[in-house]
Amino acid sequence: MVTDKTNASSSSLVDTPADETEVQPPINRRPTFLDRLMRRQTSPSSMEYSESDKKKDGPMENEQSKGVRESSLPPLSQLSLKGYKSSTKRRLLDDELASNIRNLLPARLQLFDEWDLVYSLEQHGVSLNTLYQRSNPDYQLSQLRKNKPEVGYGDSVISSMMSGNVNSMRERRRPQGYVLIIKDENNSKFGCFVNEHLRPMDQKRYYGNGECFLWKSELFTPSPSNSNSEEDISSHLATPQIRFKAFMYTGINDNIIYSNHDFIAIGSSKGQNGLWIDRSLYNGVSYSCDTFGNEILNSNSGDAKIGKFKIMGLELWRVGTLE
């Protein structure tokens, strides 16, 4: 047994042949997770990476660098709203409202730059069953294929042989979401985003996940600052502005979506729904509920306890492709 004298910092003993006079210095290697764990156990006061660990393992991403990285991402492409007829007069969705909703969607759905109108009270008539039918992805896909130009016999045979049932399964897994927009008798706009298509449930079972949220677009008059002149104050008072509010899933309960042949309910606690509309698609009510921690959707008053409303317009938009 001999001591490695070529490396003064090394105090370990190594086995060498009798004729070997020099030991190779240890190879510098990247510390493993186990190495770092052992160091932390020997130094209980150190709960974070040391400076040497940061140099070896690469720079740690802090909040500032993360913000710079996110701000450097390219902006989303211009959104296109498809489905309005030229004769449709009461259009509930505009670019500004769509952009506000889009910014809160899951990242995979924000990338879609086309939204498709699935159901409109004005264009498709007043019927809850029609809303359910048109929100079904299978029905939407059949309508899409029906409107496609016909292909030759050979192309259709090859396409069916290559796709088969595999494509059918994939189509159902494509990312989709739906935006519901309601306009009441006071011209207030509000609604929800749901991650699944609306459908009648035979049993009382909630569906949907934490990506769902409620929203409202309300008019308000901004309070003028003290530095404003009387002319500026009067102009502010005369020009109400639109304020968009969203109420995200709180996780308190899983009562996200429930729908049947009599009503649609979004969010529920203590027998009260964040948004509820009846089978006539005319009467509705909004309560504050634990599911979303929301305000009354059709009221600008923060102390309102219940918000009954009449539906003057209703639209359902699909975000995501069918094939």
From Swiss-Prot:
Compositionally biased spans, kind Polar residues: 1-14, 40-49
Compartments it resides in: Mitochondrion
GO (cellular component) term, any one: nucleus
Coiled-coil region(s): none
Keyword Mitochondrion in annotation: yes
PROSITE patterns documented for this protein: TLDC
Biological process according to GO: response to oxidative stress
Keywords carried by this UniProt record: Mitochondrion
Biased composition (Basic and acidic residues): 51-69
Domain of life, per lineage: Eukaryota
Ranges annotated as biased composition (Low complexity): 71-81
Family: Belongs to the OXR1 family.
Protein name, UniProt field: Oxidation resistance protein 1
Organism: Debaryomyces hansenii (strain ATCC 36239 / CBS 767 / BCRC 21394 / JCM 1990 / NBRC 0083 / IGC 2968) (Yeast)
